[in-house]
Amino acid sequence: IQFDVGCFGFSSMPRTTPSFTSTTPNWAGSADSATAITGPDGAWRVRCFPDRSPVFRIEGPLDRSAEGLYDRMRNVGAHEVIVESREHARRPPQFSDTELADVLRLIQGRVSDLHRDPRFRYVLLFRNQGPLAGSLIEHPHSHLVATPVIPRRLEQELRWAKQHFDYKERCLACDILHQELRDGRRLVEVSPTFVAFCPFAPRFLYETWVLPRRHQHAFSRVSPDGAAGLPGLAALLRRTLARLEHLVTDYHLVLHDAPNEQAERPAG
């Protein structure tokens, strides 16, 4: 598993900084089809529900078919919104470690649930923080998208990782992490169980990776409790984002996860 953070897709700073839209959805009161983590008072702390303007539709079969040389299928998938807090305009560094751990637990539960659907080969979590990152809504939220295909970039990285393993019989991510720990110059945050660092050749401004120190390929398999689990990840992720926000206020956060092992494989 890996969290990517940074300003990818930012070609330059615009002369006029875009702003949030004035209208914020009534997420605090939305209850239909919602999954939530609640507090002792029974009120929700974090909740998730289907996006009202989804990129994909969850109903129906994929209907894969060939059209001559080309392939086609329906835009079947899932698109959900994670509302991370009841409080408007909060930024991730303003969350407590416990609050951010609750967000990660809900995400983990939704990822595991979507993996049970054999149509979905990959589940992607992304968070656009600020107008420059493409977010038009100030209320803290992220998106979860399940697709019937594996993104091309991820397929490339899986091939590179396999080539590295075939040649050296070691995990590529673990080798990179061990080298960064030995070098020390690009480390951002370090804990006994997770590490945040800037990669050797970043692809975009302020690119930062968050990796577990112990080999783990799937976010759904991280323990929901303890320093080696989601609470430890939440604490380091919050500190990392706080450091980033001393430099920029708008950025992207993406969960780099393993493909769905339970997914159907296309015939042929």
Per-region residue spans from a language model:
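HIT superfamily nucleotide-processing domains
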Residues: 1-268
